Swiss-Prot record:
Annotated Gene Ontology cellular component terms: plasma membrane
Quaternary structure and interacting proteins, as annotated: The complex is composed of two ATP-binding proteins (LsrA), two transmembrane proteins (LsrC and LsrD) and a solute-binding protein (LsrB).
Subcellular compartments: Cell inner membrane
Protein name: Autoinducer 2 import system permease protein LsrC
CDD domains according to UniProt: TM_PBP1_transp_AraH_like
InterPro entries: ABC_transp_permease
Keywords assigned: Cell inner membrane, Cell membrane, Membrane, Transmembrane, Transmembrane helix, Transport
């Protein structure tokens, strides 16, 4: 059972989503609808993109806590360029490039300058957030072109063009990680850094690529965020980094690197967003969202740690079982007599 759960974290995440869908449905039958599924998916697109990027970084046994600030900074660039008269494709391309450059800078700090990832990205979290606020003077960006919001308008089956793009991108990244040498390098780097180097994997470049892709996903998340609400607050992206990491852990991405899938991270992001919708249904105040999300994350971390320890004990037991011969019938009988004599003495 333990091995099944460990090897099928995506299935357990999907089961959790189904349970969280059925439970509120018992309270309100209107919740059980395709419209609810598409509504939650629409709300989850930002977190899904960030979870895809976080997966790449976490697979290499690193972590990036600057993606929220990167998302905000990229959203500001998009808004500034659109208000300056640039076309939407040009503004989106520039936004994507900025995100990749920001991620590349994080990767250089970690892979080449050997700064621990948590320390480096904590620094860039403040740096990118500061650039964003200096850029806007602390003001909101409003008056964006109406064409931007069309990206989030439903086009097929209640899902927007940018929603379909997110699904296709998730499937593409899942295929790259599972079926190509490019993807296997991420797993190898996170699972055994020295071993990967001996096999010829350019581990520094793999880690820089992971952070760069993460920055690109943060830029896409900034575009989605802006298209959904039509303006850019000065706190855009705040707190998203923790939710992205939580989504990955919920979906089975190991904090120790080398294991997990993009599909699991996507399901984790959907589950976290689904919690928010259930809280709305239950009329629980919005300020409980972060508390409950944190509680769920802690619960999953504890469960993951206990599961890992149990599996390790089971593996050790199987490994050394062949060195421990079972007792002969004579030894078993002697042990039974000794136990009976001991019980008589005690009596």
């Amino acid at each position: 059972m333990l091995k099944f759960i460990q090897n099928n974290r995506e299935a357990t995440a999907l089961l959790a989503i189904v349970c969280l869908f059925v439970f509120p449905g018992a309270l309100d039958s209107q919740y059980l609808s395709v419209q609810t599924l598409t509504m939650v998916f629409s709300s989850a697109q930002i977190l899904m993109l960030l979870a895809i990027g976080a997966t790449m970084v976490m697979l290499t046994r690193n972590i990036d806590v600057s993606v929220g600030s990167t998302t905000g900074m990229c959203a500001v660039l998009l808004g500034v360029m659109l208000n300056a008269g640039y076309s939407l494709p040009v503004a989106c391309l520039a936004t994507l490039i900025l995100g990749i450059v920001a991620g590349f800078f994080n990767g250089v700090l970690v892979a080449w300058l050997k700064i621990p990832a948590i320390v480096a990205t904590l620094g860039t979290l403040g740096l990118y957030r500061g650039i964003m606020l200096l850029w806007t003077g602390g003001k909101w960006i409003e008056g964006l072109p109406a064409g931007l919001k069309q990206l989030s308008a439903p086009v097929f089956l209640g899902i927007s063009a940018i929603g379909w793009f997110t699904l296709v991108l998730a499937l593409l990244m899942a295929w790259l990680l599972a079926k190509t040498a490019f993807g296997r390098n991420f797993y190898a780097t996170g699972d055994n850094l020295q071993g990967a180097r001996q096999l010829g994997v350019r581990t520094e470049m793999v880690r820089i690529m992971a952070f760069s892709l993460n920055g690109g996903m943060a830029a896409l998340a900034g575009i989605v965020f802006t298209s959904q609400i039509g303006f850019i607050p000065n706190q855009t992206g705040t707190g998203l980094e923790m939710k992205a990491i939580a989504a990955c852990v919920l979906g089975g991405i190991s904090l120790l690197g080398g294991s997990g899938t993009v599909i699991g991270a996507i399901l984790g992001a959907y589950f976290l967003t689904q919690i928010d919708s259930v809280l709305v249904l239950l009329r629980i105040p919005a300020w409980w969202n972060d508390f409950i999300a944190g509680l769920v994350l802690l619960g999953v971390l504890v469960f993951d740690g206990r599961l890992r320890c149990a599996l390790q004990r089971n593996l050790r037991r199987q490994k050394y079982a062949r060195f421990i011969s079972p007792p002969t019938p004579l030894q078993a009988e002697a042990k039974t007599h000794a136990q009976q004599n001991k019980n008589k003495e005690v009596a």
